[in-house]
Amino acid sequence: KKVTDMNSMFSNCYSLSNLDVSNFHTTKVVDMSYMFSSCIKLSNINLSSFNTSKVKTMHGMFFNCKSLKSLNLSNFDTSKVIDMNYMFLKCGNLDNLDFRKATFNKETKHIAIFSKVPSNITIITKNEKTKNWLKDKIKSDNITIA
């Protein structure tokens, strides 16, 4: 049986600084809420093999990950995600985010998705529509189309 719920899996792992979850099988996962929330020392994470095509909620997924400076989510398919509220809230040192496969629609909840993230963050995205959506949420001009 495959895992479908990873809610709070590593939440509050205060001493965790490096994490390689590249061997995780996530093809059936629908909930990644708070998965890494408050991992305040987490500075390096490998999510390169994550299949997020069925995920519906990423609510607070990286909430309060204060030590993350760069995050590669280039393989994240967010087409089915309906809740991204607080996803990067309080990631105060995040200065580089590769979010090139991310899509957003009217139904996607996104309250405070980038609240307390540096305004000079560099975000890589896939098209002009997504760039404009992100620009409106983060109030940054450092959004690049890949």
Which residues are covered by each model-predicted region?
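Negatively charged
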Residues: 1-146
